[in-house]
């Protein structure tokens, strides 16, 4: 997962963000350690980098009206701009990610990280892992695949008769070939009789020339009559087919639902949703600023506090904040209990998360509205095509109906002509003695040749149908392959959620086992996660709901093992479990494919040696691992890791 050679060094430029006036930092692939004391704006740098990646955790410096962060990475520049107007902070720019929710939860592992805190506070771990999965999209994909499978199966059902159709056509082909062979034999026999009859009437035929001419005209007229009859029948069949097609087209046109989307209303709604999203962006940014500010106050990071309140920098405010159970409210200036501020901060954080969820829901609604608009436009295009096709078909019907009338008139004319020629031939036959039989033989020959031509045409049509049938066999094979693929995709979609939860459990358990071995917590035998189904109440009914259950197995001094709870672990142990849980989410959601950074902060509760082991272990996954550490903790890390020192005596560029 860590592909350090895939990207060049990253450069971060910051202006008026958090507690930072201006700074430039280069990050090489691998581990970068931000070393410095508390209140030296290391966390502000991490939040600025988060903001460049698309997070809402970024905040504007308290005494500035504008701020920015730029991230240069792999030949491209990503920006985040913050501006304050009438007390409202708005954001703009082109960050690395359009939606950084997954990275916020599993890659940006600051002290307030939701995955870390969920373990420490014993919150719903299943929801932490799975709430970012768009289950609505999965359900929509399942419905789409089911619909496609139904279409494929209907098409396959329509092709079920292919084998029977082929046998029928092959039988018809054999019959026609046999019929052609019989007609050719009959034609040969008649021609032989005509030749013999010609020899018997070679002499004394005064009217032979005239009779021959009449016979020729009669043969031609009969041939024309049969051709006209055949064309007339074909035209009638074509008209009938066109009428059926017209009826089908009209039914298809009538079956179009009335336009389900009012385009004007949908367009207005789209603009309204976009406007609401922009408003939420500002609100979330403001809430994040307040949450971050109060967190920094509670954590004793006085650099930002002093900068915002205009402190003289002598350190006394920091000492008071850290040492006291109360702190100065930054809104009214009175002394307030820290627990009260924590409670208010938790409520603000909940409001911020609600706004984020509302924004995510609005983004989904926006996508659905845009899809509906496109579908409505496509339906309108389809209707226009059907109307055009229906008009062309009506024109063709009119043309063929006129052709039928012309052919009917022509048939009547030819029938009268044949009757007249037969009468003339009969009269001449009486004058030419034995030539009556010859006339009859010519008539029979004409009928046989006409039948032979017709049968050959029928055979050619059968061959064409067999060729078309071969194409339909190819289509059936393709549809069968598509059905198999759709079934596989459908099964994958149906099992995706369960697969994700199973992968999360497996990843956490494997990583936890590895980390416990690395860190050497002697009194912890095992920490493992289990997926369980529990009946919970939702409204008035109880439903089965998946949950993650965290198990902690300890060993006593006597060697006995027993299961314990998370609240009995030391702060160091709880932080390690929280970090490993976040890492499991990072791996399961493949966050390394979305963003190349992993950020680490607020690990002071863990001793230096174990911090070094954690950094060494986490370093294998992201391209860039940026860790904010105290100087004494940073000393335990590998000397090859790049250090960036933070403090009041350091120049703005690094």
Curated annotation (Swiss-Prot):
Gene3D superfamilies the record matches: P-loop containing nucleotide triphosphate hydrolases (3.40.50.300)
Effect of loss of the gene: The deletion mutant forms only disks across all growth phases and is non-motile.
Pfam family, one: AAA_23
Family the entry assigns: Belongs to the Sph1/Sph2 family.
Role: Involved in cell-shape determination. Required for the formation of rods and wild-type-like motility.
Statement: the UniProt record of this protein carries the keyword Coiled coil: yes
GO biological process: double-strand break repair
Coiled coil: 135-290, 341-503
Name of this chain's protein: Smc-like protein Sph3
Keyword Coiled coil (UniProt): yes
Organism, scientific name: Haloferax volcanii (strain ATCC 29605 / DSM 3757 / JCM 8879 / NBRC 14742 / NCIMB 2012 / VKM B-1768 / DS2)
GO molecular function annotation: ATP hydrolysis activity
InterPro entries according to UniProt: P-loop_NTPase, Rad50/SbcC_AAA
Signal peptide positions on this chain: none
Domain of life: Archaea
Keywords (A to Z) from UniProt: Cell shape, Coiled coil
């Amino acid at each position: 997962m860590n592909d350090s050679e895939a990207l060049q060094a990253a450069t971060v430029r910051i202006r008026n963000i958090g507690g930072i006036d201006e700074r430039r930092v280069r990050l090489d692939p691998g581990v970068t350690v931000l070393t410095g004391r508390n209140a030296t704006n290391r966390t502000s740098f991490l939040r600025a980098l988060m903001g460049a990646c698309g997070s809402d955790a970024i905040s504007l410096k308290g005494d500035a009206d504008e701020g920015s962060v730029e991230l240069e990475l792999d030949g491209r520049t990503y920006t985040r701009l913050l501006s304050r107007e009438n007390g409202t902070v708005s954001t703009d720019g082109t960050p690395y990610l359009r939606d950084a929710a997954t990275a916020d939860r599993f890659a940006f592992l600051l002290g307030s990280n939701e995955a870390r805190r969920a373990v420490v506070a014993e919150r719903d771990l299943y929801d932490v892992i799975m709430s970012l999965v768009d289950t609505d999209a999965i359900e929509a994909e399942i419905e789409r695949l089911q619909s496609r499978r139904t279409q494929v199966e209907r098409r396959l059902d329509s092709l079920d008769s292919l084998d029977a159709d082929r046998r029928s056509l092959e039988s018809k082909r054999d019959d026609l070939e046999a019929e052609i062979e019989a007609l050719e034999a009959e034609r040969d026999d008649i021609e032989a009789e005509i030749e013999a009859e010609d020899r018997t009437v070679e002499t004394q035929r005064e009217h032979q020339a005239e009779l021959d001419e009449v016979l020729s005209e009669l043969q031609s007229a009969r041939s024309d009559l049969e051709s006209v009859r055949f064309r007339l029948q074909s035209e009638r069949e074509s008209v009938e087919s066109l009428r059926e097609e017209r009826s089908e087209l009209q039914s298809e046109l009538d079956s179009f639902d009335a336009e389900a989307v009012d385009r004007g209303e949908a367009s207005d709604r789209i603009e309204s949703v976009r406007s609401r999203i922009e408003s939420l962006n500002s609100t979330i940014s403001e809430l994040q600023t307040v949450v971050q500010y109060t967190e920094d106050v509670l954590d004793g990071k006085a650099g930002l506090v002093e900068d915002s309140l205009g402190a003289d920098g002598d350190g006394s405010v920091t000492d008071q904040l850290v040492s006291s159970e109360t702190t100065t409210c930054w809104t009214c200036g009175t002394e307030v209990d820290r627990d009260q501020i924590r409670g208010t901060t938790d409520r603000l954080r909940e409001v911020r998360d609600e706004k984020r969820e509302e924004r995510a829901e609005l983004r989904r609604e926006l996508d659905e509205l845009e899809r509906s608009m496109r579908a409505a436009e496509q339906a309108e295009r389809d209707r226009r095509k059907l109307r055009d096709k229906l008009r062309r078909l009506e024109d063709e019907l009119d043309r063929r109906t006129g052709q039928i009338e012309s052919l009917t008139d022509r048939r009547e004319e030819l029938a009268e002509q044949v009757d007249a020629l037969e009468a003339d031939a009969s009269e001449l036959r009486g004058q030419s003695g034995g030539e009556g039989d010859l006339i009859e033989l010519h008539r029979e020959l004409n009928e046989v040749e006409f039948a032979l031509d017709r049968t050959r045409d029928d055979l050619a049509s059968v061959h064409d149908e067999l060729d078309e049938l071969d194409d339909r066999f190819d289509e059936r094979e393709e549809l069968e392959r598509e059905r198999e693929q759709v079934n596989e995709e459908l099964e994958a979609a149906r099992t995706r959620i369960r697969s994700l939860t199973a992968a999360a459990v497996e990843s956490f358990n494997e990583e936890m086992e590895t980390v416990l071995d690395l860190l050497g917590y002697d009194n912890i035998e095992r920490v493992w996660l289990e997926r369980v189904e529990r009946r919970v109440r939702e409204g008035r009914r109880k439903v089965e709901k998946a949950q993650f259950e965290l198990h902690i197995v300890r060993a006593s001094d006597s060697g006995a093992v027993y299961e314990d709870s998370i609240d009995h672990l030391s702060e160091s142990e709880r932080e390690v479990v929280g970090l490993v849980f976040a890492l499991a989410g990072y791996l399961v959601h493949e966050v390394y494919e979305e963003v190349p950074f992993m950020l680490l902060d607020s690990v002071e509760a863990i001793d230096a040696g174990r911090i070094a082991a954690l950094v060494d272990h986490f370093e294998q996954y992201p391209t860039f691992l940026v860790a904010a550490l105290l100087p004494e903790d940073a000393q335990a890390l590998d000397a090859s890791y790049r250090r960036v020192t933070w403090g009041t005596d350091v120049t703005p560029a690094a």
